[in-house]
Regions:
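Mid-protein regulatory/catalytic core that forms ligand/cofactor-binding pockets
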Residues: 53-157
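Non-membrane alpha-helical structural segments and their capping/turn regions in soluble enzymes
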Residues: 24, 88-91, 168
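Short, charged amphipathic alpha-helical surface segments
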Residues: 12-67
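Short, positively charged
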Residues: 1-13
């Protein structure tokens, strides 16, 4: 029984009243313990593979180039931000959002992102976030917190640094891209930091991404 890693105290207890039923129960209890360990280790393995996949995406990022791709509809766990609250209160909202994401030991698909007004962005203004978003875990996130990002064409760019320091530059770049390709923005701006303080202590080494849904002007 020790070869099955059954504790000595349980073996001693069994030997005091040994019979077929007790032996079967001893094995069933050990089986249950093994299955629980396998499940826990599988979760850890899934998290490791998710992080490695994310790191690989960062490694192969093409920076400074706007791409236009079709994306399917996607669910996001969304926490809205009141437009009238202060900067300190925004930090509190972000903390509450993070609590939702991490409360069940769920690894995020990507870092927590935020949504900015397209009107502010195209004026070169880094405004307050309208909401924070994360990829949800459908097993426990309440449905009322889930928002669908529509399918469609998305213009996306990855760049080194943080948006706060490059807002005007990126605004001009997107404006030129939309005009050149006869496109118009139809949604607000999705912002995420792919490489952050967990991977570097220099914000100039951060890798960020912004994207927005667009439509062709020729459809009108």
């Amino acid at each position: 029984m020790r070869k099955l890693n059954i504790p000595i105290n349980k073996i001693k207890k069994y030997l005091q009243n040994r019979n077929e039923t007790s032996f079967a129960q001893l094995l069933l209890d050990k089986e249950k313990e093994c299955l629980k360990t396998i499940e826990e280790n599988q979760k850890i393995l899934n998290d490791i593979q998710l992080v490695l996949k994310h790191l690989n995406k960062i490694k192969h990022s093409h920076l400074g180039q706007i791409t236009l791709t079709f994306r399917k509809a996607k669910q996001f766990l969304m926490t809205p931000v009141d437009s009238n609250i202060s900067g300190t209160e925004i930090i509190d909202v972000l903390a509450q959002h993070n609590l939702k994401v991490f409360s069940k030991e769920h690894f995020r698909e990507k870092a927590v992102g935020w949504i900015l007004s397209q009107n502010d962005f195209f004026q070169g203004i880094y405004g307050k976030p309208k909401a924070f978003f994360s990829t949800p875990n459908p097993l426990y996130h309440e449905q009322q917190n889930i928002v669908i990002r529509p399918e469609g064409l998305y213009a996306t760019i990855r760049f080194q640094g943080i948006l706060l320091e490059h807002t005007q530059e990126l605004s001009d770049l997107f404006n030129d891209f939309l005009v050149s390709n006869r496109l118009k923005a139809v949604d607000d701006i999705y912002v995420i930091t792919l490489k952050d303080h967990w991977l570097t202590d220099d914000i100039k080494e951060y890798i960020s991404q912004i994207s927005l849904r667009v439509e062709s002007l020729d459809k009108e």
